[in-house]
Swiss-Prot record:
The gene is atpC. Pfam families: ATP-synt_DE, ATP-synt_DE_N. Residues 116-125 have a biased composition (Basic and acidic residues). Transmembrane segments: none annotated. One of its GO terms (molecular function) is ATP binding. Residues 112-136 are annotated as: Disordered. This is ATP synthase epsilon chain. InterPro entries: ATP_synth_F1_dsu/esu (IPR001469), ATP_synth_F1_dsu/esu_N (IPR020546), ATP_synth_F1_esu_C (IPR020547), ATPsynth_dsu/esu_N (IPR036771). Keywords: ATP synthesis, CF(1), Hydrogen ion transport, Ion transport, Membrane, Thylakoid, Transport.
Length: 136
C-alpha cells in the first residue's frame, strides 16, 4: 500500500506522486502518516516535510506554513510556499540562515518593536527550514 502525496503552493504544484510514508511538521509537533491513517485536517508549521518513496529513499520539502488533509490514503498539503530540498542551494540556504540568526540576535539586544522581532523570528524559521531540507 502507498499514499498519494500532493504539495501545492499558490503558484505551483511542488510535488505530486505516490510515497510510502510522510512526516509533516504540524503546529503541534511532527506527525507521521502511513497508509490507512485516519482522516484528518491539521495546520502545518514552517518546517520540513519528509517523505519516503517506494525505493526507500527519503526526500525533504521545505514548507512555509499551511494546512494538510489526510483522507483515504491521499495526503494533500496546501502551503504558502514550498521548495524541494534537492532544488535548494546548500551554501545559499546556510548563508541566509546565518544572516537571519544575526538579524534576530541584533533585534533581541534592543528594546523596541515586537512586530520586527516576530518578522525576524519568522524569517529565521523559514531559513532554518530551507537549510534543514537541503541537508537531509
Amino acid at each position: 500500500m502507498s499514499l498519494t502525496l500532493r504539495v501545492l503552493a499558490p503558484d505551483k504544484s511542488v510535488f505530486d506522486d505516490t510515497v510510502e510514508e510522510v512526516i509533516l511538521p504540524s503546529t503541534t509537533g511532527l506527525l507521521g502518516i502511513l497508509p490507512g491513517h485516519i482522516s484528518m485536517v491539521t495546520a502545518i508549521d514552517i518546517g520540513v516535510l519528509k517523505l519516503r518513496s517506494s525505493n526507500g529513499n527519503w526526500d525533504s520539502i521545505a514548507l512555509m506554513g499551511g494546512f494538510a488533509e489526510v483522507e483515504s490514503d491521499d495526503v494533500t498539503v496546501l502551503v504558502n510556499a514550498a521548495e524541494l530540498g534537492k532544488s535548494i542551494d546548500k551554501a545559499t540556504a546556510e548563508k541566509e540562515f546565518e544572516q537571519a540568526k544575526a538579524a534576530l540576535n541584533k533585534l533581541e539586544d534592543q528594546a523596541g518593536n515586537s512586530a520586527d522581532k516576530l518578522k525576524a523570528k519568522e524569517s529565521l524559521n523559514k531559513a532554518r527550514a530551507r537549510s534543514q531540507a537541503v541537508g537531509e
